[in-house]
């Protein structure tokens, strides 16, 4: 737009395992591998500025208006990660953490972590955005099995603020939770109740899922069968 007229263009990307993720001639352009830490959840992805125009995707040439291989500068500061839509959250400047939510159903084959690398620009350079996609199989099928133990949840009365959530896996890996239905949200290991709609018909059903994704790599663990617990809120 007009407000960026006269500003230089900059290009951002992401590194995985110390190497830039290759630009590809696809809609998302960057396709990092599903490569997690020992916890099976943390993805190390370091945003960076390109120092020359990349030829892997025609968009670099289009965005920069320069031929591939041409040196290119960038603004001060660092680019950052932002989630577009995903069962994941940004957990630090250089990590995403898989965090299952009701966006993914366990009946599908795969789900995508769509994220972007951004820099807001400065007085010399215009903002830069680069999207990327990690493909996540809904279930990891290699490695040893694991099973979740998640005790049933008791019914509650309206007005309860929160209840603790406790579940474990025989793999020793940490179990996560998400709210599948009902006026609730998960915050860490607690289920927090939101304000009830004034016309709510009691009892109101709540459904919570405990999950453990497993891990890839040298000691692979399969995805656990998710355990769903349902309870009621009474007036």
What are these regions (language model features)?
Residues 1-235:
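Solvent-exposed beta-strand/loop surfaces, strongest in extracytoplasmic domains of secreted
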């Amino acid at each position: 737009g007009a407000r960026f007229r006269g500003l230089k263009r900059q290009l951002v990307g992401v590194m995985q395992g110390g190497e830039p993720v290759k630009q590809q001639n696809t809609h998302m352009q960057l396709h990092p591998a599903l490569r997690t830490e020992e916890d099976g959840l943390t993805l190390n992805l370091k945003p960076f500025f390109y120092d020359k125009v990349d030829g892997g995707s025609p968009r670099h040439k289009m965005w920069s208006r320069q031929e591939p291989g041409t040196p290119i500068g960038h603004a001060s500061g660092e680019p950052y990660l932002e989630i577009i839509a995903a069962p994941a959250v940004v957990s630090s400047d250089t990590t995403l953490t898989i965090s299952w939510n009701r966006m993914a159903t366990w009946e599908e084959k795969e789900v995508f972590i769509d994220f972007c690398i951004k820099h807001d620009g400065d007085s010399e350079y215009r903002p830069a955005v680069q999207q990327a996609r990690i493909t996540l199989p809904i279930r990891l099928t290699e490695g040893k099995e694991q099973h979740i133990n998640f005790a049933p949840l008791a019914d509650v009365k309206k007005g309860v603020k929160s209840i603790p959530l406790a579940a474990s896996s025989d793999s020793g890996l940490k179990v996560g939770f998400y709210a599948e239905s009902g006026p609730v949200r998960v915050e860490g290991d607690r289920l927090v109740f939101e304000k009830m709609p004034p016309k709510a018909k009691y009892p109101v059903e709540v459904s919570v899922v405990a999950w453990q994704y497993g891990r890839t790599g040298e000691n692979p663990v399969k995805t656990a069968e998710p355990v769903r617990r349902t309870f009621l809120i009474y007036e």
